[in-house]
Amino acid sequence: MTTPDALEPRTCIRVLSTRLHSRRGLYLILAMARTTQADLARQFLALHDGRKTLVLPNAWDVASARIFEEAGFPAIGTTSAGIANALGYPDGQKISRSEMLAVVHRIAAAVAIPVTADVEAGYGAKPEDVAETAREVLAAEAVGMNLEDTVDDRTDLLADISLQKEKIRAVVETSALAGVPFVLNARTDVFLASIGAAETRLARTIERLNAYRDAGAQCLFAPGVKDKETIAQLVSGVHGPLNILATAGTPPVAELEKLGVARVSVGSGPMRATLGLIGRIALQLREEGSFSLMTDGAMTYADANRLFTR
């Protein structure tokens, strides 16, 4: 018979939960869960120490998460756009918080490495709303989250800096109460949304990210930047680990590491690449009646099932 000692921490917790029914047993389970999540959070935070650029793949379901884990990545992020699209929503907080975090929870429960959640602008205009989102992210077993400074679903308007700092502080306080060294990745969309005159964007981005760092954010995210000169200026100007979004034209990881970038994420790129492949398969199947795009390089049926039977 398999014993709890032979299982991974999360599995062990589930097994124990079926055997311990006393109040004391419940407290033991909760303590173990908190310790395990805190350990994963510490592992994830340590990956931002700047000694090596953290390459963070972004999953949209359990299958993609398990593939990234099997590939040897030390941590996984989720992609809000990927999860939303997979469930039939456009990106931009059109999917509900509960639906988003249900997927995050399934991903976190399926892998043995840290998971950080993309929860867009935090699902609320007030700090207390964002604090509740952070509590639910923690309940979903994630150890970090992205927080954008956009307003509602508008891409042309950013939140007031002082209000965004209050939201960040609310997340930091929430994670401290939970006893988890949560990694908050504070994002500004100045470059991504082309906010303001082009010549002002660098200074505005640095101002915002440093304000977010002062409020307690552990990592600082500036999507929409891809030229090496601007990246180098951001690394020099911000007072914390910098996260860059990999898109077409982004320098390779080796160059980003030389520039001092702490973290590179890929967002919805892999999910959209998968959709592109499905589109090509569909076109070949309909127009040619052939199957090579589907069969060449495909994961075997056995390997696909093996992802979920460890």
Task: Identify what each model region corresponds to.
Residues M1-L7:
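Polybasic, low-complexity intrinsically disordered segments
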Residues S17-R19:
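Ser/Thr/Pro/Gly-rich low-complexity, intrinsically disordered segments
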Residues H21-A31:
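Short, Lys/Arg-enriched N-terminal segments with co-localized hydrophobic residues
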Residues A33-A38, F44, G269-R310:
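Extended, intrinsically disordered, low-complexity segments
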Residues T35-L45, L54-L56, W60-I113, Y123-G240, ...:
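Alpha/beta enzyme core
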Residues S265:
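Active-site loops and adjacent core secondary-structure elements that bind or stabilize anionic groups
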